[in-house]
Structure formats: C-alpha cells, structure tokens
C-alpha cells in the first residue's frame, strides 16, 4: 500500500492502513478522511504522485503570479505589493479550495515551493515588466492552461475528501478562477469572471463536471485527467480566439452584447 504524503495540492493518494493515531487506530498517513470518503479510493485510476502534474501546477502558479504582478504594476504598487499580488493570483484559488474542504495547512501558506514560485513570479515581473507586458497574449494562453489544470486538480481533490458531485464541481471551479478573483478584488476591480462576459468560468464548470462524471464511472486515469485538462484549455482558447462571450442582460427585447 502506498503511503500518502502531506501534500495539499496533490491528486488523491492511497490511505496508509499501517499508520496509527495516538489511540492506536488506523488513520490516513496525510489527513483523516472526511465522512463518506471511504468510497472514494485511488484505485479508481489516479496515480498517487505524478511529477509532471506537479511541474504543471508550479507553472500555473508562476503564470498566475505573473498576471497578478502585472496588475499590481499597472496600479503603481511597490515591490511588496507586487509580490503580495503575485502570491494572491498564483495561489488564491488553491487557498480558497483548501479552506472550503478543510485541508490544512492551505497550499497558499503550507508549501514553500509554491510560495517561492509565486514570489519569484512577482520579482520577475518587477524587473522585466516592459518586456513581459508585450507578451500579454502568451501569458493569457498560459493562464488558460493554469485554469484548466487547477480546475481538474481541485475537483479531484474535493472528490478524494468525500465531497459530493455538486460540491466537487464548485471546489474545482473555485480553484480555477479563485486566484483571478482575489487579484481583481485586491486591486479594487470587479472580478473579470463576473463582468467581462468572457467564457472563463463556463469552461471550468464543464471540465469539473466531466471530471466528476469520469470519477463516478471509475474511468478517471492519467489519460482521462489529461483529456479533462485539455477540454477546459481548448474551450478557453477557442473563446479567446473567436471572442465568444456570455450574453449580457436583456434590454427591451434586445440582448446585451
């Protein structure tokens, strides 16, 4: 039996039945299972620790941090404010997710490599922002990838801790969009996901729902996780390429654009 590691941002891991608490009863080596979590097991297909996915998540944190730092620079923040906003944008979604599902310490304060990656993104933008600002389109593409990965990872983590299908979809979407929401709130803006009518949260909802469906049919594997990530990424990129927007409010028989 594989032993779980204290790794708040990983996909679900096997429970170590040999570990015991102070009363001598078996417990998970990393965290206690939530009620109902016994029916949610790793043998449904997700490997316990995939370095590639960890690397991809770190890349997502870095790119999210770049977007936060860029927003801070546009607001004329100092170096401290830039780094703080990079941390918020890169790790805000995971932080919200872990607080909601009771995974402590949250990834935003409990994993030094994630914190360092987000802060490094802030420092990088501080020194190189004239060049990086011209690469906004590329950053937007990477941000779409971060949205896709965080959504699927967040959904699987919710399922692994015993959350129901609806709750797990919500957890996945919050993980995907939470960093951007926190970034916008800290800069005094209405979150983009709420007012720009972009297809941003909708791809996350679709991807999280597909992940739950795969889990419930025992079809979740490394391949299908990758396909779910690709689905969210593809929908977001298509929306960006063809300027697909969510309809605005209905005004006197004319739909808002």
Per-region residue spans from a language model:
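Short, structured motif recognition centered on aromatic/hydrophobic residues
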Residues: 84-88, 95-101, 170, 174, ...
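Small-residue-rich segments of transmembrane alpha-helices in multi-pass membrane proteins
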Residues: 86-94, 142-156, 198-212, 256-257
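Structural signature of hydrophobic alpha-helical transmembrane segments
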Residues: 49-61, 106-120, 164-177
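The first (N-terminal) embedded transmembrane alpha-helix
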Residues: 54-67, 85-88, 207
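C-terminal ends of transmembrane helices
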Residues: 65-76, 98, 123-136, 181-193, ...
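A cytosolic-side transmembrane-helix exit/cap motif
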Residues: 101-109, 133-139, 158-168, 186-196, ...
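Cytoplasmic-side transmembrane-helix entry/capping segments in multi-pass membrane proteins
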Residues: 80-88, 111-115, 136-147, 171, ...
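Helix-coil boundary and interhelical linker segments in multi-pass alpha-helical membrane proteins
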Residues: 44-52, 99-109, 153-167, 213-224
């Amino acid at each position: 039996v594989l032993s779980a590691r204290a790794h708040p941002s990983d996909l679900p891991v096997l429970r170590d039945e040999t570990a015991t608490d102070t009363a001598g009863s078996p417990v998970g080596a990393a965290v206690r299972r939530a009620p109902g979590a016994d029916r949610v097991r790793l043998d449904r297909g997700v490997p316990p620790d995939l370095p590639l996915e960890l690397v991809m998540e770190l890349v997502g944190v870095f790119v999210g941090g770049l977007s936060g730092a860029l927003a801070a620079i546009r607001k004329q923040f100092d170096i401290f404010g830039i780094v703080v906003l990079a941390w918020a944008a890169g790790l805000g979604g995971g932080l919200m997710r872990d607080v909601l599902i009771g995974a402590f310490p949250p990834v935003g304060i409990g994993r030094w490599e994630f914190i360092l990656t987000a802060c490094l993104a802030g420092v990088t933008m501080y020194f190189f922002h004239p060049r990086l600002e011209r690469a906004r389109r590329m950053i937007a593409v990477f941000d779409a990838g971060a949205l896709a990965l965080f959504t699927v990872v967040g959904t699987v983590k919710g399922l692994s801790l015993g959350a129901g299908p609806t709750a797990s979809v919500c957890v996945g979407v919050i993980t995907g969009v939470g960093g951007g929401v926190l970034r916008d709130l800290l800069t005094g803006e209405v979150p983009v996901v709420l007012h720009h009518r972009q297809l941003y949260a909708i791809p996350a909802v679709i991807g999280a729902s597909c992940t739950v469906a795969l889990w419930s049919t025992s079809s979740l594997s490394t391949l299908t996780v990758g396909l779910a990530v690709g689905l969210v990424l593809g929908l977001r990129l298509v929306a960006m390429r063809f300027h697909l927007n969510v309809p605005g409010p209905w005004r006197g028989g004319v739909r808002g654009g």
